[in-house]
Design a protein with these regions (language model features):
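Acidic, low-complexity/disordered tracts enriched in E/D and polar residues
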Residues: 1-48, 52, 103
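Long, charge-rich, low-complexity alpha-helical segments
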Residues: 36-103
Length: 103
């Protein structure tokens, strides 16, 4: 069942972790985890790298450009994978979208 608050991820999206979730390195297990009320998710290394870019400021397009340059990889392939991963996390309630910036 979905909450109705999920986002539809596109290259224009500016995803971030919601207030109730934190990306944290678990020293005991030596893995990165997303901590949310009554839930823990252990993303893989690639997901962690993408999640660390999800600051609500960068757009998905900016993240894809950065990753494509870093890994000298095909931008369209990275975009497809990043959007699919972020959409999956959003559908599970681990991501939200930044609202318009207030200065």
């Amino acid at each position: 069942m979905t909450s109705g608050r999920n986002i539809s991820v596109s290259e224009a999206s500016r995803p971030k972790l919601p207030r109730h979730a934190r990306l944290k390195f678990d020293e005991t297990r030596q893995v990165w985890v997303i901590l949310a009320p009554e839930r823990v998710l252990a993303p893989d290394e690639i997901a962690v790298e993408v999640l660390q870019l999800c600051d609500g400021i960068r757009s998905v397009a900016d993240m894809v450009d950065q990753l494509a340059a870093k890994y000298a990889a095909d931008r369209s392939a990275i975009a497809t994978d990043v959007i699919a991963m972020l959409q999956d996390l959003a559908d599970k309630g681990f991501l939200t979208e930044a609202r318009e910036a207030t200065l």
